[in-house]
């Protein structure tokens, strides 16, 4: 078996709208193409031995063990690889379940589709599944050592890529509120919301976490001084930078017991508490000094009591946890080392922050703590005896938590909220040492030891004892108060032809409202009036660029076939999804071989329209009109025929539509007709002579109307939008060159040629065409381009693209010429393969009063050649 290609889908896609995270692996079964599993000796038994947990896969039989029944009866290897890839992820606690395997048009080559949690782990699972299945085919088994290595690698990949527990808590709450989110590449930052409504978080820092407050929280001594000046009970202490100052510092705080910690530490690193001797103080100083970036150390009086974390969000105390240091409880049988291992077997414990609790690690701090208690790792404790392994209670070092939110004294609650206001942090963790949180700190000699920016949420969300607190909810309430938006309107546009023009017109209409519009197209990414990135930008990366921009108020996104197949859409839902048409273009590419399959690709845009949005569909195209059956939102139709039956039935049910009637672009709402503008007054329609441009205008006007854009803004938009080289390069750009005219259009498929031909046929003078086609199109498509050219033009110059896309030089041109001659064996044609030469020749040779129509590979090049001739 051989993996030919692997795609990672990250949004709604051809295979599934709901399951956005999919791996699509193109797999050549090679020698196994004609061998079902029941014909491979020992395969079933080997697979069950290696992965007995596959018994949990239902598959098409619909019951436990169903998949293994299929293997025993006989199924092909692509299907088995799919299930193995899923199971490998399941075994590493990545919940997945969706899969599909489909044979392509090439016998023996399959698309194996399966769900993933982490994309790198998903891709690895696909490769490992192929290795595993191949090994069982060849040897009857898969070595246990290799399986264990695969599972270990998968765990590492997931751990390295997954969100931290606090961030995951916030993201989960955002999802519950239908707030979109996306991971940003910068320092584990996450964006919540789109465009102008976005907020950002990094762990539990937010947009509102001011730099001064964060810096102050990191400055332990500065924080203590400010709180002390405000009358807040804080430890008596001082700072030193040199070892020689340690003895006097101990005297200054009143002698032993003391605490020594780094000035700028976190997560409990470098802290030693309950120091009672000079030797301990020396060791603690060295530890703290090494941990401090500035070599500055805090020496404080030690206060007896339990460690508590108070969490304040947006000025309100939302949770309290008592933190218990890492410890073991004796059973009169096991050594301390064995008890640590037993404790670490708790499924809630993981490495670092990847689970509710962290595994306890034995290091010099643990050994020192045991030594201080006269114990060693091989010591056996009495039953019920508790031995603490660390002095600090951080969860990151194996500690646990008990919820105390309902126990805190009102005065302590008030003090915590006051401290948050004094420091100025929106999300703050306050560390308190007190023997009794139910009593005021002053009454029990309790103190606030420090405050923390970016506090962890694990101890509150999943305490070892007590109630779980949804501390993410108040964060979301702060970032997105009730009724405040998190999304910008998204208009997604797809189709075979007309996408870019419709995208630009829709964006132009929205700009009449005064909003900042971001849009993507085959020309580039634009925000407002400005080009941000040049080139073909119709995929999810470019859409993400718009949705990440903090100035964008409306997103208009051209969504082409290629991006949908390669990565899926960049958004989960849209407000308007426009499908203009589906024609025979790009067939044979990406395993899309029929026009019906292409309609399924384009239909993704209609299917992601949310319940209150509109799918704007072409009622004149049966494949597009049929998409209404899959739409979860509302449907609005457009048609060049006011008598279209679909339009009539739809408006009779008070539906919304746009039609071209009596020369007008009109909106129908139920039985009411609202005329936007006469087509002759809409520049892009070439005085009403370009029907396909009228259809594009219908779609754009209807989309804007569905979104509540004022009629006058729509009217002004279509009146001022021109099919010029500046506004819509490569879309019906007509140039007056004095004695003749030139027209540049990026049509590159039969439907596009037909559409331009409808306009060209009305030209009174000579019609000269400079034609070509992409080399990766089917032979029959290139032949059809030639047939259409022969019907439209008096004279034809056949050229080729610079990028031959896998064909030999002259091959694409020969197919077009075959089409020309099959339509008209007396056609006036000439082959000039170089595009620049063909354009120059056409412009030189066209008759006076004639029209040169150029279908270029490079729109920029064609326009540049024309501009050199100084068009009027």
UniProtKB/Swiss-Prot annotation:
InterPro entries registered for this protein in UniProt: ATP-grasp, CbamoylP_synth_lsu-like_ATP-bd, Cya_phycin_syn, Cyanophycin_syn_N, Mur-like_cat_sf, Mur_ligase_C, Mur_ligase_C_dom_sf, Mur_ligase_cen
Domain ATP-grasp: 224-480
Keyword Metal-binding belongs to the record: no
Keywords, ordered alphabetically: ATP-binding, Ligase, Nucleotide-binding
Any one GO BP annotation for this protein: biosynthetic process
GO molecular function list: ATP binding; cyanophycin synthetase activity (L-arginine-adding); cyanophycin synthetase activity (L-aspartate-adding); metal ion binding
Keyword ATP-binding on entry: yes
Transmembrane segments: none
PROSITE patterns linked to this entry: ATP_GRASP (PS50975)
Highest taxon above the source species: Bacteria
Catalysis: reaction(s): [L-4-(L-arginin-2-N-yl)aspartate](n) + L-aspartate + ATP = [L-4-(L-arginin-2-N-yl)aspartate](n)-L-aspartate + ADP + phosphate + H(+); [L-4-(L-arginin-2-N-yl)aspartate](n)-L-aspartate + L-arginine + ATP = [L-4-(L-arginin-2-N-yl)aspartate](n+1) + ADP + phosphate + H(+)
Residues annotated to bind ATP: 495-501
Entry's EC annotation: 6.3.2.29, 6.3.2.30
Function, as annotated: Catalyzes the ATP-dependent polymerization of arginine and aspartate to multi-L-arginyl-poly-L-aspartic acid (cyanophycin; a water-insoluble reserve polymer).
Subunit structure: Homodimer.
PANTHER family: CYANOPHYCIN SYNTHETASE, MUR LIGASE FAMILY MEMBER
Family label: In the C-terminal section; belongs to the MurCDEF family.
NCBIfam families linked to this entry: cya_phycin_syn (TIGR02068), PRK14016.1 (NF010623)
Protein name as catalogued: Cyanophycin synthetase
Gene it is expressed from: cphA
């Amino acid at each position: 078996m051989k993996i030919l290609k692997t795609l990672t889908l990250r949004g709604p896609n051809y295979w599934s709208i709901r399951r956005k995270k999919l791996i699509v692996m193109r797999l050549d079964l090679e020698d196994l193409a004609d061998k079902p599993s029941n014909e491979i000796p020992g395969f079933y038994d080997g697979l069950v031995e290696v992965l007995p947990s596959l018994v949990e896969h239902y598959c098409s039989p619909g019951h436990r063990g169903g998949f293994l029944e299929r293997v025993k009866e006989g199924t092909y290897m692509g299907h088995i690889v799919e299930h193995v890839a899923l199971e490998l992820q399941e075994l590493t606690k990545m919940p997945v379940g969706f899969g599909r395997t489909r044979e392509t048009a090439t016998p023996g080559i399959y698309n194996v589709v399966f769900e993933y949690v982490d994309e790198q782990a998903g891709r690895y699972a696909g490769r490992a599944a192929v290795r595993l299945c191949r090994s069982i085919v060849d040897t009857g088994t898969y070595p246990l050592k290799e399986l264990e290595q695969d599972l270990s690698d998968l765990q590492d990949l997931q751990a390295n890529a997954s969100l931290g527990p606090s961030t995951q808590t916030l993201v989960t709450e955002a999802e519950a509120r239908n707030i979109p989110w996306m991971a940003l590449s910068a320092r584990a930052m996450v964006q919540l919301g789109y465009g102008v409504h976005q907020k950002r978080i990094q762990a539990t820092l937010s947009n509102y976490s001011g730099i001064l407050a964060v810096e102050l929280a990191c400055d332990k001594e500065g924080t203590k001084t400010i709180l002390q000046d405000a009358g807040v009970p804080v430890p008596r202490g001082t700072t030193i930078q040199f070892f020689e100052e340690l003895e006097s510092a101990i005297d200054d705080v009143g002698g032993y017991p003391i605490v020594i910690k780094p000035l700028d530490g976190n997560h409990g690193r470098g802290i030693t508490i309950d120091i009672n001797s000079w030797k301990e103080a020396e060791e603690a100083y060295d530890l703290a000094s090494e941990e401090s970036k500035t070599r500055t150390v805090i020496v404080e009086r030690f206060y007896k009591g339990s460690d508590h974390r108070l969490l304040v969000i947006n000025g309100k105390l939302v949770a309290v946890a008592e933190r218990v240091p890492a410890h073991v409880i004796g059973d009169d049988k096991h050594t301390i080392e064995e008890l640590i291992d037993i404790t670490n077997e708790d499924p809630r414990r993981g490495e670092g922050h990847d689970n509710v609790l962290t595994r306890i690690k034995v290091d010099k701090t643990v050994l020192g703590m045991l030594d201080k208690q006269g114990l060693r790792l091989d010591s056996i404790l009495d039953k019920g005896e508790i031995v603490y392994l660390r002095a600090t209670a951080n969860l990151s070092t194996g500690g646990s938590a008990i919820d105390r939110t309902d126990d805190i004294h009102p005065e302590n609650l008030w003090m915590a909220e006051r401290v948050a206001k004094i420091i100025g942090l929106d999300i703050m963790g306050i560390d308190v040492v007190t023997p009794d949180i139910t009593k005021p700190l002053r009454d029990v000699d309790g103190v606030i030891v420090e405050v923390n920016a970016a506090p962890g949420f694990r101890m509150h969300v999943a305490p070892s004892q007590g109630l779980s607190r949804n501390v993410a909810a108040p964060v979301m309430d702060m970032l997105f108060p009730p009724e405040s938006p998190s999304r910008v309107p998204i208009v997604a546009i797809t189709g075979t032809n007309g996408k870019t023009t419709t995208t630009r017109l829709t964006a132009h209409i929205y700009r009449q409202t005064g909003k900042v519009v971001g849009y993507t197209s085959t020309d580039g990414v634009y925000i407002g009036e400005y080009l941000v990135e040049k080139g073909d930008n119709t995929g999810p990366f470019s859409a993400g660029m718009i949705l990440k921009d903090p100035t964008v108020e409306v997103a208009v996104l051209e969504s082409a076939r290629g991006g949908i197949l390669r990565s899926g859409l960049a958004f989960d839902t849209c407000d308007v999804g426009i499908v203009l048409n589906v024609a025979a273009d790009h067939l044979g590419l990406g395993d899309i071989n029929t026009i019906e399959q292409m309609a399924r690709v384009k239909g993704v845009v209609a299917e992601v329209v949310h319940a209150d949005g509109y799918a704007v569909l072409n009622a004149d195209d049966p494949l597009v009109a049929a998409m209404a059956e899959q739409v979860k939102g509302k449907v609005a139709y457009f048609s060049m025929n006011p008598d279209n039956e679909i339009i009539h039935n739809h408006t009779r049910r008070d539906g919304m539509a746009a039609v071209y009637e009596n020369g007008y672009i009109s909106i129908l709402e139920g039985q009411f007709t609202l005329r936007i503008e006469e087509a002759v007054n809409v520049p892009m329609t070439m005085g009403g002579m370009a029907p396909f441009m009228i259809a594009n205008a219908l779609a754009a006007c209807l989309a804007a109307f569905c979104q509540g854009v004022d009629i006058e803004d729509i009217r002004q938009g279509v009146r001022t939008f021109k099919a010029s080289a500046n506004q819509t390069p490569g879309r019906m750009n007509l140039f007056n060159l004095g004695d003749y005219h030139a027209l540049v259009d990026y049509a590159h498929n039969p439907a596009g040629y037909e559409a331009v031909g409808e306009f060209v046929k009305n030209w009174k003078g000579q019609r000269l065409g400079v034609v070509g086609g992409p080399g990766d199109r089917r032979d029959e498509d290139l032949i059809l381009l030639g047939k259409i050219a022969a019907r439209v033009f008096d004279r034809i110059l056949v050229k080729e693209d610079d990028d031959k896309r896998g064909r030999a030089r002259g091959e694409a041109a020969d197919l077009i010429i075959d089409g020309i001659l099959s339509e008209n064996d007396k056609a006036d044609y000439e082959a000039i393969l170089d595009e620049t030469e063909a354009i120059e020749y056409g412009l030189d040779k066209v008759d006076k009063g004639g029209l040169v129509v150029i279908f270029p590979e490079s729109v920029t090049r064609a326009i540049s050649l024309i501009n050199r001739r100084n068009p009027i």
